[in-house]
């Protein structure tokens, strides 16, 4: 290799011959990727930044342009499976913003293909398991419920011993003298299970829509849980979803007073959710060992969607057809005005 050749490379006049590149990499003791300045794997912080940048872009920029940018990033880092996974999560949270049903369907197929790519090539078993769940959500978005069930039922049998793994791990930590690890893991698991119960209960309210006794008992028990653990302060989004579903249910049961009560509680949760410009998950005085774990999540403590994006959904929430039953109620009108003030 002559000095003249190197000079031309440095000035971008010409490129090294392909056969020369591995020789140069060996000479300098680096990989070919390092020699070319190509980084096929991104760090957690880099992935998080890309996610947040694109999430904000969905809120303020052209949808099609943002999707094209995401596709370009995925092509460039196709073997960075955590990045590909997060881009699927991002698209799943925003694909309904596409202007036509055809574009939405195309995005669902694209996400499904990316999930298949991760599952086929990634060596990280935990990421592959998460990708299977993500693929099931994508299939459900496209109305492929039977296919989603085939994925989910295989991993959700309540009879399996794996359901006991959390408590067994805490016991193992204690027996090994790792009290700090036992405490950390117990808190994290309790926190996750609490919100899993609240979220599943919101789903159960839709199942119990024909059984008011079961509906009432579910609301009563979950409300007690919300109050005891001060869950509105911990995760206002999960609580708001539950209260909203309770309000809709009581409208179906023609109980306007109960519906208004839970609509008010729904707005209390929304007010907490919107109180900060960038709502973040966090612990409290009781869950005082989980903040570090939250920051280690793929997207840290921040919301998976930009504020402007989910505010649009909130703005339309009291326009559900069931709320027509309350359109002449003065209390409901005041609640509508409160919602408008919150999102302006």
Regions found by a protein language model. Name each.
Residues 1-16, 37-41:
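Recognition helix of helix-turn-helix/homeodomain-like DNA-binding domains
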Residues 57, 91, 98, 139, ...:
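Residue at a conserved register position within TPR or TPR-like alpha-solenoid repeats
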Residues 197-329, 333-334, 338-344:
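Alpha-helical protein-protein interaction modules
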Residues 45-76, 86, 93-102:
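Alpha-helical segment of the N-proximal tetratricopeptide repeat
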Residues 65-74, 102-121, 143-157, 179-192, ...:
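Alpha-helical repeat scaffolds
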Residues 19-34:
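DNA major-groove recognition helix of helix-turn-helix/homeodomain DNA-binding modules
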Residues 44-50, 79-84, 95, 123-132, ...:
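Generic helix N-cap/helix-start motif at coil->alpha-helix transitions
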């Amino acid at each position: 290799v002559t000095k003249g050749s190197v000079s031309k490379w440095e000035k971008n006049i010409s490129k090294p011959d392909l056969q020369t590149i591995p020789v140069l990499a060996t000479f300098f003791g680096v990989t070919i990727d390092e020699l070319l300045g190509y980084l096929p794997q991104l760090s957690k912080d880099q992935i998080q930044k890309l996610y947040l940048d694109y999430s904000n872009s969905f809120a303020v920029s052209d949808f099609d342009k943002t999707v094209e940018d995401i596709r370009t990033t995925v092509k460039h880092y196709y073997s960075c499976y955590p990045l590909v996974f997060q881009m699927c999560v991002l698209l799943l949270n925003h694909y309904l913003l596409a202007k036509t049903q055809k574009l939405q369907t195309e995005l669902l197929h694209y996400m499904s293909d990316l999930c298949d790519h991760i599952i086929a090539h990634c060596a990280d078993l935990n990421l592959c398991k998460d990708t299977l769940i993500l693929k099931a959500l994508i299939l459900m978005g496209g109305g492929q419920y039977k296919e989603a069930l085939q994925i989910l039922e295989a991993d959700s049998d309540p009879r399996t011993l794996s359901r006991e793994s959390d408590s067994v791990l805490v016991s193992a930590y204690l027996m090994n003298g790792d009290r700090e690890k036992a405490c950390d893991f117990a808190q994290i698991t309790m926190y996750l299970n609490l919100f899993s119960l609240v979220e599943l209960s919101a789903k159960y309210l839709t199942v119990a829509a024909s059984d008011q006794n079961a509906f009432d008992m579910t609301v009563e028990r979950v409300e007690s849980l919300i109050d005891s653990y001060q869950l509105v302060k911990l995760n206002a989004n999960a609580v708001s979803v539950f209260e909203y579903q309770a309000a809709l249910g009581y409208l179906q049961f023609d109980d306007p007073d109960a519906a208004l009560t839970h609509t008010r509680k729904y707005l209390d949760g929304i007010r907490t959710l919107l109180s900060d410009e960038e709502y973040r998950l966090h612990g409290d005085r009781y869950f005082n060992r989980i903040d570090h774990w939250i920051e280690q999540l793929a997207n840290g403590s921040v919301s998976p969607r930009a504020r402007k994006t989910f505010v649009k959904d909130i703005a339309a929430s009291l326009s559900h057809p069931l709320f027509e039953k309350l359109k002449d109620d003065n209390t409901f009108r005041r609640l509508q005005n409160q919602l408008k003030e919150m999102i302006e």
